[in-house]
Amino acid sequence: MKIFGLVIMSLLFVSLPITQQPEARDVPAYDRSEVTISPAETPESPPATPKTPVEKKHAEEINKYIWGLNYDKNSILVYQGEAVTNVPPKKGYKDGSEYIVVEKKKKGINQNNADISVINAISSLTYPGALVKANRELVENQPNVLPVKRDSLTLSVDLPGMTKKDNKIFVKNPTKSNVNNAVNTLVERWNDKYSKAYPNINAKIDYSDEMAYSESQLIAKFGTAFKAVNNSLNVNFEAISDGKVQEEVISFKQIYYNINVNEPTSPSKFFGGSVTKEQLDALGVNAENPPAYISSVAYGRQVYVKLSSSSHSNKVKTAFEAAMSGKSVKGDVELTNIIKNSSFKAVIYGGSAKEEVEIIDGNLGELRDILKKGSTYDRENPGVPISYTTNFLKDNDLAVVKNNSEYIETTSKSYTDGKINIDHSGGYVAQFNISWDEVSYDENGNEIKVHKKWGENYKSKLAHFTSSIYLPGNARNINIYARECTGLFWEWWRTVIDDRNLPLVKNRNVSIWGTTLYPRHSNNVDNPIQ
């Protein structure tokens, strides 16, 4: 994972956990009987209300039940993507003045994600302290929240300057609405008391990228939230597979702050006194669906960017990296042209704009200006939930989603048509023999070579003779031979040039001159084709 100090852009999200108020200092309303501020440093777990004998019995049974669940935390949250059995063969095709060779290789990706991305469609299910089942629904980013009575919990925020007293809040009844009110209270407390001392809080940037080849591969990389994201990004997997475009997907998490939940000292601490083991069993809490809780939520902005180029160059990724980082490519014509002729599409979640999701298209030259917007947190630039972390309730261990997928990596290379320019100005009769191989591929990807010859081979040419031989992009192993007639009985023909297995170039200039006894030649290249 790369950490870039990039600044992302204006993001949107309607269901904000931090409500923007008409006046800057208005604090969101909440039920003070449910959300209270701890008067002193809060202990590791919030103080529990004394339990009745029945409630103690329920707690003991819940602890015994959850502690007794037998599951493998390393295999319970797994996304298994596509399995590749057949790799399509190598192929080539003519495209205008180029011959394109497309090659495919089997690849695999294995990604462990502790943070699960949030997008608007599921944000209502996500809040700090939520009790969820660690199962397929969580892997699919559709957490199944347990509808049970909850005990109190303590939230904390990591905004700078806040004391241990101010950065925590005690939530008596942690329903979603009460938790969101508590989050608003914590953040507004910082806005009121600490924002002047810390006027420019730069967001923490979490950056990752992946050249795109299949949806399954990108889901394994970025999580199952990418399914919904791609409805807007529209990665062109068909064109990528055909070798017609190269696309890269980049994910930015611009994190303003994290809301954390204190770890419970035992599983029962997260349940109200009336909740029983039988209720949990009836709700499907078992070894296949063990309980977990959202231990941390990151608030900020999430940006997904698709970079797209029709270039067949192997420098496309380098060009994309330069465009994103602002690195100068002055002097590198190839990188400059790739950047100039590439485009991007950005899907942005969060921020102060009115729309839920903002979608922006443009060329790469405009992208960095967009990314520079909204680099710091303030009241007018609020964050939204962009990712969350879950822990198993049994032992507070981190619940890591393991994403695996195989995919076909497609690479393409273009070979531009070229030509050989012949110039004969020598004082003699000359003959040429020019030949080459033209390459193609059969249905199994095996290379087929067809030998080709110039139609004027071994025809006598007098000075001054010029001609151009046009070669297709799939021409290989070019041979150029010329001889001159000396008039000498013992050496009637003398070799002037004999160059073999030459590469295809845009312009190859072959000249012969001189006399019968002293023939000369040159073989020069203009604009070599890489």
Swiss-Prot record:
Q: How does it sit in the membrane?
A: Multi-pass membrane protein
Which first-to-last residue range defines the signal peptide?
A: 1-25
Q: Where are the transmembrane segments?
A: 215-228, 235-244, 313-322, 330-342
Alphabetized Gene3D superfamilies for the sequence = 3.30.1040.20, Perfringolysin (3.40.30.40), Perfringolysin, domain 4 (2.60.40.1430), Thiol-activated cytolysin superfamily/Thiol-activated cytolysin, alpha-beta domain (3.90.840.10)
Q: Which InterPro entries match?
A: Thiol_cytolys_C (IPR035390), Thiol_cytolys_C_sf (IPR038700), Thiol_cytolysin (IPR001869), Thiol_cytolysin_ab_sf (IPR036363), Thiol_cytolysin_sf (IPR036359)
Q: Where is this motif: Cholesterol binding?
A: 516-517
Q: Name one GO biological process term.
A: killing of cells of another organism
UniProt GO molecular function: cholesterol binding; toxin activity
SUPFAM superfamilies in UniProt? Perfringolysin
Keywords carried by this UniProt record: Cytolysis, Hemolysis, Host cell membrane, Host membrane, Lipid-binding, Membrane, Secreted, Signal, Toxin, Transmembrane, Transmembrane beta strand, Virulence
> Where in the cell?
Secreted; Host cell membrane
Q: What ranges does the record give for the region Disordered, renumbered to this chain? A: 36-55
Top-level lineage group: Bacteria
Assembly mode: Homooligomeric pore complex of 35 to 50 subunits; when inserted in the host membrane.
Which family does the record assign?
Answer: Belongs to the cholesterol-dependent cytolysin family.
Its biological purpose: A cholesterol-dependent toxin that causes cytolysis by forming pores in cholesterol containing host membranes. L.seeligeri is non-pathogenic, perhaps in part because this protein is about 25% as toxic as listeriolysin O. Mutating a single residue in the undecapeptide increases toxicity 2-fold. After binding to target membranes, the protein undergoes a major conformation change, leading to its insertion in the host membrane and formation of an oligomeric pore complex.
Query: Under which name does UniProt file this protein?
Result: Seeligeriolysin
